[in-house]
Amino acid sequence: KSPKWIAKRGRILRRDSYECQNCKRYFKTKTATTVHHIYFYEDYPKLSLVSWNLISLCSECHNKMHNRFDDTPTKLGISLQEKKKKEFENWLYPPTNRDKN
């Protein structure tokens, strides 16, 4: 784990008040222990330190995001990716000045 990742992880946990953001959706309070890459690091390493691609989760919810047999996103993981689809598309295909006219 790089020094940049360690620093970024701390910033994301602070941003999310050290609370699991998935549990919070269900009005539960659980301490986040993991910072999850919404679009997986293995597939998109350039997104590894991008804030919108990171979310604080408890270990139980983090395990619900990954299929542990083949490390693909689960249904829950895919739904999280869908929520960030606009940010992902803007990263993948940045708008140009030409697009604004």
Stretches found by the model and what they are:
Residues 46, 58-61, 81-84:
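Glycine-rich loops and low-complexity Gly/Arg-rich segments
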Residues 13, 45, 96-99:
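Amphipathic alpha-helical interaction segments
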